[in-house]
């Protein structure tokens, strides 16, 4: 479930978006939370805040005021990584942040374009990468062009566009 609290109606633990994950195929229901908790101990990586939630729902959509709470079971609440999440973790809330839907470090010149390009198609772009931060895609495009330019040594590309320590820790995790 994704619960959005209305603007100017307050927050829950500093969050307006509350994500509740069930993990029905994971019998123990704790691996996802364990992974986030383990990441907290690695300063070179970012981890989202999580907690277990035992969810009860009272459905009053039919107008019945005497509905009973129904036990929906155990969920993991995971912090939403968005502009607020970036700020909460000491990062630039106006920085580039993308949710990867389908991505392989290809340039995809027909889709990944600057927003002011007349042929820019937001829906096509977000089919690959959902924009969760700044809509300025210049850094993304520069990095993709460098990664796909085989005349540039990969060490140069890594040094210019990536944090080697971060990548090393991520691969080790």
List each model region and its residues:
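Phosphate/dinucleotide-binding and metal-coordinating scaffold of catalytic cores
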Residues: 1-173
